[in-house]
């Protein structure tokens, strides 16, 4: 099997969730003791999140991590968070091994489940930037995003609570999803930040839940097994 490389640390909690899915999905697919080889390069999230050079500095950090994984023998590489995919093309150009996009894996799964209209939740960057919404719309999906004040609150919950495994405002997130189901006719919700699945589970809401971290890891394991 191919060796998987993951750029982690964005945040450490979501990287742990990736690893939990790696164990669960590998056992479902291969049995109790067979796992693709996996290398995790965990970056310093403080240097990433509050980089004084903004996305130029963040991109440099991610490229250095991807190159380190390539040198370590990774044959496929991924980012373990949604927001850094804003610079996915730049990172892919910097390495010679293929990278696996969380957005491409998500689109494939959304088509498989047959949904059309979805609510996108994530960091404020993910919800407002074009890179995510445009990819989904070009693939034929209707994408709904929260209003500005809701985006601010979701972003706060992600970085101030979920990043520390604090689920105090889980009811707020559930109520928001259900309201958009009633008022906007959404058929599914994209948990477009890999911290969100730590709080929101498929049985919590009445619409399809797209856990991007689990979907991404499943795709990585499928590709590793080819």
Summary of predicted features, one role per range:
Residues 1-226:
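Non-catalytic structural scaffold of enzyme domains
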